[in-house]
Amino acid sequence: EFVALVERLIGLPWPIRLDQFDSTAQQLGWSPTGDTGIFTGNFASGEQRIMCTKDKSKNVRVISIPFFRPEREGFEEFGLVNDAFVAYVAAGFEVWGKPFQIVIDRYSHVAWKYPQNVIVELTRYERFVDLSFYTPQGIRVY
């Protein structure tokens, strides 16, 4: 699921204006919430809110998805978050090779850069795993 979503995002015809992103989001299986740049989608741990930010030209810059978030919050769930992070990193490593950035600390993260001039960053927080997709318009802020 993680790799398939990233591949679909990479293949989109960037730049895309945020105010024109609704139809693209719906093709990805996401639903508009009525708030510009906020969508909902179903992932491994259920329905999550997706946030898209824009640049000065109103093009989508970064798509942020809490890709894995357990329903409950406890010690056991912390382990699930870590396991999910490790599994997603392993899947990415298998398909795209070694990330260009690996940080192991309280909020560990890895990042891959692609020839299409996009960056995918996967971050493990205490309660969830976040997927941040930097479009060619957003890569400048990375």
Task: Tell me what each language-model feature is.
Residues E1-Y107, Y114-I119, T123-Y142:
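Short helix/turn-capping signatures at newly exposed starts of structured segments
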